[in-house]
């Protein structure tokens, strides 16, 4: 971290001495929280939205998770133009604009408009998300990188828990419209945080004369077998995560569990353990390596899936805890791996990874939603298990120590 500059407020570089590690971790985590809090918070009110728009669970689930479509597109766009984008300014603009579609969701007249606004949200969220990952990769020292990425993913985890709790509470007491206005205010708070805490950085093309063209960077990344595997793993992780935490909402409110809207929000305390464990991902990789850490994470998530089929709230909650801990730990591991495997054009590599990651969420929503509607929850869980298995197979390609690109 850079020392504070009084005339500019507290501006922080994402590197530095141990005395600033805690403050750096808090800033990184809070930035992540405010960047993606809209992504999953709406899932806590999925049953209420389905009733309001009078549509099926699959239709509402696809509309809510269509934000991942925008995120995939934005991830690719940012990866193309990453070398020309000032990190801090890009993050600041993305979070500011994000508040507009978020507020408009409060007055969306139909499902088509709702879906379009969620896509717009995704475009803004992914732009900020991708640029922040690139910023961390470029500004962190090798020793600090694992902890920085773990802190960022931990903020993501916290947004899942707190976002869902807040969304359920606000919607239950003040209505669906107030819920979206509240989250628009959080988006603006994120922009303010970035303005006062993130140090200025130059576009990468200004940092050296040998910058590659965007398409050359893409080709280099896709020729790297380890990066290709990591991109596929990202796809599978969000496929499994969204498949679980979108459609389990409908299982929880139906017999025999039959919990209410406010109780549904409190269910997401299942993410609390993930907030603690995800911070340890960097240490785990440093001690055991990328591949064993990923396999252990995916296995833990797989162990939780059968519990989701039992007619017991305690069993389902335990299963959700295990799936959450496993998938978030795997995400933090894969994200950090991509940053180090791509020793050049990290913004481009992060963009491709996030495009694959969020595409997995969209595909998972579409496919598993149809399975849920037409075949049932057990078949849906089977599809989720399959995606974790594919991720485990892809992890074979990852070496203990990432290889550098030429």
Q: Where is each model-derived feature located?
A:
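Helix-to-loop junctions at the C-terminal end of transmembrane segments
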Residues: 75-86, 277-289, 372-373
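Helix-breaking motifs and short loop linkers at transmembrane-helix boundaries and internal kinks
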Residues: 54, 86, 107-112, 141, ...
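Paired small-residue
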Residues: 101, 112-121, 314-322
């Amino acid at each position: 971290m850079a020392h504070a500059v009084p005339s500019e407020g507290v501006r922080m570089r994402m590197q530095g001495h141990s005395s600033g590690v805690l403050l750096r971790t808090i800033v990184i985590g809070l930035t992540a929280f405010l960047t993606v809090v809209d992504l999953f918070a709406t899932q806590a009110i999925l049953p209420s939205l389905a009733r309001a728009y009078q549509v099926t669970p699959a239709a509402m689930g696809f509309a809510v998770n269509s934000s991942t479509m925008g995120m995939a597109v934005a991830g690719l766009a940012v990866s193309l133009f990453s070398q020309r984008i000032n990190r801090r300014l890009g993050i600041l603009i993305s979070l500011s604009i994000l508040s507009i579609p978020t507020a408009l969701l409060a007055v969306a007249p139909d499902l088509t408009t709702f879906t379009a606004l969620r896509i717009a949200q995704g475009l803004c969220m992914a732009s900020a998300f991708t640029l922040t990952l690139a910023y961390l990769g470029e500004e962190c020292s090798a020793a600090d990188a694992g902890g920085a990425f773990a802190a960022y993913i931990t903020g993501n985890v916290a947004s899942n828990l707190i976002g869902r709790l807040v969304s359920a509470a606000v919607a239950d007491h003040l209505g669906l419209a107030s819920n979206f206005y509240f989250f628009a205010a959080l988006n603006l708070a994120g922009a303010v945080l970035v303005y006062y805490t993130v140090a200025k950085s130059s576009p990468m093309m200004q940092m050296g004369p040998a910058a590659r063209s965007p398409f050359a960077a893409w080709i280099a990344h896709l020729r790297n077998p380890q990066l290709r595997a990591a991109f596929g793993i990202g796809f599978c992780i969000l496929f499994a995560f969204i498949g679980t935490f979108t459609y389990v909402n409908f299982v929880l409110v139906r017999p025999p569990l039959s919990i209410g809207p406010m109780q549904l929000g409190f269910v997401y305390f299942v993410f609390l353990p993930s907030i603690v464990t995800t911070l340890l991902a960097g240490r785990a990789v440093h001690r055991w390596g990328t591949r064993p850490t990923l396999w252990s994470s995916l296995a833990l998530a797989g162990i939780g899936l059968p519990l989701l089929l039992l007619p017991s709230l305690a069993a389902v909650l335990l299963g959700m805890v295990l799936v959450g801990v496993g998938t978030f730990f795997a995400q933090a591991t894969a994200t950090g791996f991509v940053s180090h495997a791509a020793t050049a054009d990290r913004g481009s590599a992060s963009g491709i990874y996030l495009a694959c990651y969020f595409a997995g969420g969209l595909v998972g929503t579409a496919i598993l939603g149809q399975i849920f509607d037409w075949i049932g929850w057990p078949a849906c869980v089977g599809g989720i298990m399959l995606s974790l298995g594919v991720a485990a197979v892809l992890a074979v390609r990852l070496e203990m120590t990432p290889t550098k690109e030429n």
